Amino acid sequence: MRVQSISRPYIRPHSNGPHVFDRARYHEGTVRELRLPRRQVYVHTAHYVGWLAERNKFSRNYASPFLFKLLRMRLVTPIKVYAHFGGCLVDDMLTMEARAFSMSYFDFEQGHYLKDYCALSRSSPDNILRTRFTWQLYGTMLRLIDERFRRWGGSIRTRGRALAA
């Protein structure tokens, strides 16, 4: 498989409104059936939302600097950040670069995010809602998403500096 080294431009997949990557409410019925705590509807996507927040990939209209700082300090979990956005991740919330990357990587059908998440959390796609949040898994996911993003051709800003792709 050839690694894509140049980032692709963002093209909205359809013209009738924003593209919804995921909504926590899509998983409420399953979480209820499995008798899991309600917060489990957030966990698998919260890892990605946390990465977006920590890497400054939210658009200005959605950036929440204080909350994101608390996340970086590990005083709130990415679940709290995702809940702050109503448990919804939509393309309009992201920078253009993050939208393009998310269309490629975070797509549940074609992308690598769920495969990566399942591999690192040692769960199957049928069991991801059972995976509990841990800071260790979150840290490992951050590093892996960083690597996927660099391979895709993106640059990561940390404290005002861009890291080479």
Describe every region a protein language model picked out.
Residues 71-141:
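Amphipathic protein-protein interaction modules
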Residues 13, 20-28, 34-35, 52, ...:
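Polar/charged low-complexity regulatory segments
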Residues 57-61, 111, 154, 158:
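Intrinsically disordered or highly flexible coil/loop and linker segments, enriched in small
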